[in-house]
């Protein structure tokens, strides 16, 4: 008798490893149903807008589920043209590739989007004349349309939308995109969900939100008052993994008896089902009277300030200290001395503390000469710097 293969949605499709942001990587066992669940959502929500025979520029690592699903598997299914970079991606290389390939949709991490906007866009539109024109009600709309067209050219002219995932988008960049009507989208997920949990396309984008639950997934916040008090974001559905490879203890720690996967992320949820991730529960710090401090929110503000390339906020002896890697290219271009840089950072610290609650004030800024070590999805490996003071 001939034995034919019987399709089983629970069959193991792949083992993908977590990015290791908070520690060692774990092997995530993803069944075919999880891959299908993600593809079914993308086909429903993205395919009608981009169709077939599109150009896709791959800027994300294929070893990470975000890139593997959105850039590779989804577009293989659609039969699109995928262009791979032949060198390690840098903002300059990506900018060149965008202008040449003109992708129909772009998937990226916030770091890349941030660099393109700050290097290629802001220097042209943050002149006194441009600011004056954008603030004049009579011509404001026309100017913003021109700015939108200019920004689109920097992202390849014709993307249906630019999808940001892997980490939150910087608030300054996000507000700029919204103000000029740029087609920004946001996805949120984990390796354990292959990867999508929530998504916001440009037509239902809400500032600060990572979107609403995707098709096939239930998502909720474990809080008595989820609109105002952050709780852990949990999800359940066909996108969820089978478990961690040869690690039942770790599996049981994140998937409860009712099938809910515990992400470890703290979030709130508004009345319309939009989720707002505040930070990782493992990263959350406690203020002097037990207040919750989310270092990611402080870092987001600090990263928009003068001469700051990236930062990490850590706690040392009950005080908050910001480790800052300066934008050395800008520092050198302007001819700043070490003393100049120290003075700028102190001014940054004072401005930062005016924008945040008193219990979350940063006591000092310490300069970090090298870029912080990152995962494949460009998230800083925070655990390496907890004892850096």
What is each residue range found by the language model?
Residues 1-17, 24, 49-55:
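Conserved pre-ATP/AMP-binding loop-to-beta segment of ANL
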Residues 13-39:
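Conserved AMP-binding A3 loop
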Residues 36-55, 63-149, 158, 183:
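Conserved AMP-binding/adenylation subdomain of ANL enzymes
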Residues 83-85, 162, 169-231, 239-242, ...:
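Conserved ATP-binding loop and adjacent catalytic segment of the adenylate-forming AMP-binding
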Residues 220, 227-287, 304:
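Conserved ATP-binding/catalytic segment of the ANL
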Residues 240, 274-303, 329-340, 356-362, ...:
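Adenylate-forming
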Residues 266, 304-328, 353:
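C-terminal boundary motif of the adenylate-forming
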Residues 285, 310, 318-321, 349-389:
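Conserved C-terminal "lid"/linker of ANL adenylate-forming enzymes
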């Amino acid at each position: 008798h001939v034995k034919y293969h019987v399709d089983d949605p629970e069959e193991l499709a792949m083992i993908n490893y977590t990015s290791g942001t908070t520690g060692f990587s774990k092997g995530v066992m993803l069944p075919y149903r999880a891959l299908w669940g993600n593809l079914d959502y993308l086909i429903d929500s993205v395919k009608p807008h981009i169709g077939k025979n599109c150009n896709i520029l791959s800027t994300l690592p294929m070893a990470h589920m975000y890139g593997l699903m959105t850039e590779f598997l989804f577009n293989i299914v659609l039969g699109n043209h995928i262009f791979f970079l032949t060198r390690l991606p840098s903002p300059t290389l990506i900018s060149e590739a965008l202008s040449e390939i003109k992708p129909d949709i772009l998937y990226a991490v916030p770091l890349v989007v941030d660099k393109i906007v700050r290097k290629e866009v802001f220097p042209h539109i943050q002149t006194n004349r441009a600011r004056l024109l954008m603030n004049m009600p009579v011509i404001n709309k026309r100017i913003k349309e021109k700015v939108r067209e200019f920004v689109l050219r920097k992202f390849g002219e014709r993307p249906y939308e630019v999808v940001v995932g892997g980490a939150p988008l910087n608030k300054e960049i996000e507000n700029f995109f919204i103000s000029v009507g740029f087609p920004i989208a946001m996805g949120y997920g984990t390796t354990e969900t292959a990867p999508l949990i929530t998504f916001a396309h440009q037509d239902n984008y809400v500032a600060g939100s990572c979107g609403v639950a995707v098709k096939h997934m239930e998502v909720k916040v474990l809080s008595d008052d989820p609109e105002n008090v952050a709780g852990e974001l949990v999800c359940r559905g066909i996108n969820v993994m089978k478990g961690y490879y040869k690690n039942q203890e770790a599996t049981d720690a994140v998937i409860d008896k009712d099938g809910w996967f515990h992400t470890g992320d703290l979030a709130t949820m508004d009345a319309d089902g939009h989720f707002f991730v505040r930070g990782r529960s493992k990263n959350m710090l406690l203020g002097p009277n037990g207040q919750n401090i989310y270092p990611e929110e402080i870092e987001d503000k600090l990263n928009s300030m003068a001469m700051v390339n990236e930062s990490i906020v850590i706690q040392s002896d009950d005080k908050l200290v910001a480790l800052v890697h300066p934008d050395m290219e800008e520092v050198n271009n302007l001819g700043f001395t070490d003393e100049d840089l120290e003075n700028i950072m102190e001014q940054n610290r004072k401005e930062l503390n005016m924008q945040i609650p008193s219990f979350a004030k940063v006591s000092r800024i310490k300069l970090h000469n090298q870029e912080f070590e990152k995962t494949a999805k460009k998230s800083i490996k925070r655990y390496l710097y907890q004892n850096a003071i």
